[in-house]
């Protein structure tokens, strides 16, 4: 049976594939040359963001998703990439991450935030599992304008509603600013440029008691 996860994997493999290494590079640039540590890729789907991060760094990467079918595909992709020693899958919802406080140096998430039911709870969870000095890079995008144009053109050929759906999902910088103000994250950046729309924050201090 063709599941949603299989369909997304096919699109990622055949159309999106050049965007992932570019996005991984942009994410790792936020870590300013630190190429070791642990990374949680939330809403990983078939895992191409996390796998690209693993290829471009020495990080241990957890591909985390609440769709078991997506994780089965992710496992195959990990094996094909020969990255079983550094990349693994874990099932769960972003709103309740099954890891202790301060477990990850980097939390990434591309193309998933739009689907989260309780985004405030989810972002607070991400902040909780980030190590001190850790970075979160959450949102959506296609790497750069040229890649976005290529994806739009190919997606429009198979779905004439692609641009409408993509615009509806994307939201805007103001929505993200307002969302973040409701969370325990006090310092963050919302960047909207050719790379997409992303929330970036670094964990530099614990939230105060009132913020818990
Ligand atoms: C459009 S796919 C993006 C996959 C991948 N990040 C990429 O960019 O290729 C969105 C993924 O987010 C996952 N997802 C949605 N809501 C989630 C949640 N609350 N917790 C964990 N994963 C979630 C879905 O199961 C799906 O695999």
Where are these regions (language model features)?
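Short alpha-helix
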Residues: 166-184
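A conserved beta-strand element that flanks and buttresses the S-adenosyl-L-methionine
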Residues: 108
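Class I SAM-dependent methyltransferase SAM/SAH-binding core
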Residues: 40-96
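A short glycine-rich, Lys/Arg-flanked "PGG" loop and its adjoining helix->strand segment in the class I
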Residues: 120-132
